[in-house]
């Protein structure tokens, strides 16, 4: 299997495993990845998802260019490929639970697109990130581009797209493409994921949903966001949090 889902307690890890091709994503993988994300979201025992490579020193080299060259003359394939890539980005970006990318190597083109669709990105010092359609004569989709603009702002997004440059980890951190540089990104992501998993899940998932609404242009509360606030006071997590605070102990959510 070139993609697989592993579980460790409340954390699932989605592994990209195609090392001979530097984890380049072919059509079958683009179609499979959203299903694995949905599997993790549907598993009530899972609270956080990590996206990473099964092979140290790699993340994802993007789309399979050999497949592009072989199949791009087929309009039906182009439509299916565009739909599968968008479905992958959407599944990661709209996942109700937190998603962390652990990047230990190059995240290029569609590989960088996978990373920016996650909530947080932890990279090794050796990581490089870039979005390179301008070197291939192709166009990055609007949904993917919005994720980039939301993350780094329009001016930096334009520079990333227009230059098609690869950015080392320090530069990627400086421009906001990643959140942290650590020598063992998967271990750090796992530690962070377990810390998140120990917190109140209604709080985390509601916060993620509210941030998403803000990025989509919503500027004030509506009935759904007001309900998130009100409902929190009726849930077991609130009662446990208050009791733990009063008892000077860690809450058990």
Q: Model-derived features: where do they sit?
A:
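C-terminal long alpha-helix characteristic of the crotonase
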Residues: 122-127, 178-224, 230, 234-236, ...
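CoA-thioester-processing core
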Residues: 88-94, 102, 108-161, 175, ...
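Acidic, divalent-metal-coordinating active-site segment for phosphoryl/phosphodiester hydrolysis
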Residues: 165-171
């Amino acid at each position: 299997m070139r993609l697989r889902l592993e579980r460790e307690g409340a954390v699932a890890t989605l592994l990209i495993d195609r090392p001979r091709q530097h984890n380049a994503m072919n059509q079958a993988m683009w179609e499979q990845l959203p299903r694995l994300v949905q599997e993790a979201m549907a598993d009530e025992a899972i609270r956080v998802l990590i996206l990473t490579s099964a092979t140290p020193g790699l993340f994802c080299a993007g789309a399979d260019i050999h497949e592009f060259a072989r199949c791009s003359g087929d309009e039906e394939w182009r439509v299916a490929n565009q739909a599968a890539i968008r479905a992958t980005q959407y599944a990661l970006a709209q996942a109700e639970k937190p998603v962390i990318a652990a990047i230990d190597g190059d995240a290029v083109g569609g590989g960088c697109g996978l990373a920016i669709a996650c909530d947080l990105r932890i990279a090794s010092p050796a990581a490089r990130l870039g979005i390179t359609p301008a070197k291939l004569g192709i166009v990055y989709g609007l949904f993917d581009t919005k994720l980039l603009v939301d993350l780094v702002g329009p001016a930096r997004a334009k520079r990333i797209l227009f230059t098609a440059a690869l950015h080392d980890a320090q530069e990627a951190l400086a421009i906001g493409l990643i959140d942290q540089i650590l020598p063992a990104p998967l271990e750090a992501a796992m530690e962070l994921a377990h810390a998140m998993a120990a917190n109140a899940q209604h709080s985390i998932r509601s916060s993620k949903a509210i941030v998403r609404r803000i990025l989509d242009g919503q500027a004030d509360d509506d009935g759904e966001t007001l309900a998130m606030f009100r409902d929190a006071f009726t849930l077991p997590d609130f009662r446990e949090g208050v009791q733990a605070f009063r008892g000077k102990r860690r809450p058990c959510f």
